Design a protein with these regions (language model features):
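Detector for C-terminal structural segments
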Residues: 12-19, 24, 321-348, 392-399, ...
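N-terminal lobe/hinge region of extracytoplasmic solute-binding protein
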Residues: 48-99, 130, 214
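Aromatic- and charge-enriched surface segment that lines or borders ligand/interaction sites
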Residues: 93-144, 177, 307
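Surface-exposed binding/hinge segments that line
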Residues: 107, 141-201
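Gly/Pro-rich hinge or "lid" segments in bacterial periplasmic/extracellular proteins
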Residues: 182-242, 246
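Ligand-site clamp/hinge motif
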Residues: 207, 227, 235-280, 293
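A bilobed periplasmic-binding-protein/Venus flytrap-type ligand-binding module shared by bacterial periplasmic
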Residues: 232-236, 291-316, 320, 329, ...
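Append "and occasionally in soluble cytosolic enzymes with long acidic Gly/Pro-rich linkers
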Residues: 309-402, 406, 491
């Protein structure tokens, strides 16, 4: 049973309503509050986003909405710098990486407490890591795809995938040592993910983190319903609170309705601007902010379906799809066609990519010589949602399905509401669907942010079992930064394109529209904006 199935939306919201040689040191500190007597912020701010979180614990959930809520309430040892994405001090003031790159010693910030009054100390850090380790070792299906499992390669039932996590030691109240079995190059960047933010040990013991977050962040949870999550500024926050006293994250699945809500003043901003809304917003002089492409949309090919065990069939799928037309007509301007799963910003584009270009006749020829015999293939796609990698999935499905049908595929459309467990359905190991529309949004600045969740294990999102490919992905993650690592990722991208575990479609741009109240919106390519950094007029 997946996490979403184990703890449904109705239960979550009911419960949430109840609880209100190398040595590197962190530098550049986030400011602490000028004084506890400073008046708390009074402004209210309402952001409309596309879906409700099915739970609040980012260590279990991978949705953008869960991360958006948790980023306001919880904090990690390190945070991503807004300008560079590089790790910067947060709950850890500084750190030192051992010469063999197999341990990091963190010095923790003093005088920080959780929202429930519990002291933040080394024991609290260990309690969180112990919880994450136990989750990754759980037999639950969702555990294979939680961030701790994919980052540390931990808990896989496959003996070919070995963990790089060795444990956390408490040296003293303000010092913890994170130990690895082997080097993991992007470790500090990976720890900036919302999934590695600290919850109160009391909430961990109570097992309530998925219903009521208790962290050290600038906001605390006030209430949650299927329509809205409300957060209040935490007056005893150790850092800068900013100008927002009440933050509401309102669920509005339809992009046109989100746009209308902004134009009528019901909300102050909304995420994931729909394709048809850019012109109306421009006519009204509404500011639209664009994120850099840091996601990939793809057409999933279920390898457990017999037809897709044939490489010719998989290549026929790619040749049938006009990915250039998709990127141009169904995504915002600035979206790039994807020939690989890793975005261009890392400069690891393969030198010999094998994804076929749009060629319907070639697709027909491949099908004719393949093992496919016209059997109907179930095509699962989400509806009533927008994602950073798939803003209008119904329209994407319509175009792709028409192109596949024209070259000879027989399809059975299977639409499914996102909030009714779509992500579970496409991630189920024994699912009987053949095609699925999905994607992945990068959560930290490294190619492994894409490779690990998609391809590091047979239980990864693409569900592709290739021992050599898995070994190469996991080896590249530990290589020191430099030309050799860059070359390894280029080779990996070439190899993935040859095997075609799925069809990469695009690296989409996503956009946020903001009202005239907003002076400075803390836009992030990952979507993990911190609203205490928001500046209002």
């Amino acid at each position: 049973m997946t996490a979403e199935k184990a703890f449904g939306r109705r239960t979550f919201f009911a419960a949430a309503g109840l609880g209100l040689g190398l040595s590197l040191s962190g530098c550049g500190d986030r400011s602490t509050r000028s004084g506890a007597s400073a008046p708390p912020p009074q402004a209210s701010f309402v952001l409309a986003h596309a879906a409700a979180p099915t739970g609040l614990d980012p260590s279990r959930r991978t949705s953008q909405e869960t991360s958006r809520v948790s980023t306001q309430v919880l904090e990690g040892l390190v945070a991503a710098d807004r300008s560079t994405g590089e790790p910067s001090p947060a709950l850890a003031e500084s750190w030192v990486v051992a010469d063999d790159r197999r341990s990091v010693t963190f010095t923790l910030r003093e005088d920080v407490t959780f929202h429930d009054g519990t002291e933040f100390d080394a024991a609290a850090v260990k309690a969180n890591f112990d919880k994450w380790q136990a989750q990754a070792e759980s037999p639950e299906a969702w555990a294979r795809q939680c961030a701790f499992a994919t980052t540390f390669r931990h808990g896989s039932p496959d003996p070919r995938v070995s963990t790089c996590y060795a444990g956390v030691d408490v040296a003293d109240e303000r010092t913890v040592v994170l130990r690895l079995t082997r080097p993991y190059t992007p470790l500090l960047s990976a720890l900036t993910q919302p999934a590695f933010a600290m919850s109160s040990p009391e909430s961990i013991r109570a097992g309530t983190e998925d219903q009521h977050l208790v962290g050290t962040g600038p906001f605390r949870l006030d209430s949650a319903t299927p329509e809205s999550v409300k957060l209040l500024a935490h007056e005893d926050y150790w850092g800068e609170l900013g100008s927002v006293g009440t933050l509401e994250l309102r669920v509005v699945p339809d992009p046109e309705v989100r746009c209308a809500a902004l134009l009528t003043g019901e909300v102050d901003a909304y995420d994931l601007v729909g394709l048809d809304d850019f012109a109306p917003l421009a006519r009204e002089g509404i500011q639209v902010l664009y994120r850099d492409p840091y996601a990939v949309s793809y057409l999933g090919l279920n390898q457990r379906v017999r037809a897709f065990q044939d490489l010719d069939v998989r290549r026929a799928v790619a040749a049938a799809i006009d990915r250039g037309s998709l990127a141009k007509s169904l995504y915002p301007n600035g979206t790039n066609v994807a020939d690989q799963f890793v975005p261009a910003r890392f400069n690891v584009n393969g030198d010999n990519l094998q994804i076929p270009g749009y060629d319907p006749q070639h697709a027909k020829d491949l099908l004719k010589k393949s093992s496919y015999r016209g059997e109907r293939l179930r095509f699962l796609y989400p509806r009533h949602t927008s994602r950073m990698y798939l803003q209008e999935p119904e329209r994407v499905y319509a175009q792709i399905s028409a192109q596949l049908t024209r070259v000879g595929f027989r399809l059975q459309p299977v639409p499914m509401d996102w909030d009714e467990g779509y992500l579970d359905a496409v991630s189920t190991p024994d699912g009987d669907h053949a095609f699925s529309l999905l994607g992945w949004s990068g959560s930290f600045r490294d190619p492994d942010s894409f490779m690990a969740p998609l391809l590091s294990a047979p239980q990864a999102r693409l569900g592709f079992d290739d021992a050599g490919l898995m070994t190469a992905v996991n080896r590249a993650a530990g290589m020191p930064q430099g030309d050799a690592r860059t070359s390894a990722y280029k080779t990996l991208n070439d190899r993935v394109s040859e095997e075609m575990p799925a069809v990469p479609l695009s690296h989409p741009v996503s956009a946020v529209a903001v009202s005239s109240r907003v002076v400075n919106y803390p836009l992030s390519s990952t979507g993990f904006e911190r609203f205490n950094d928001l500046e209002l007029a």
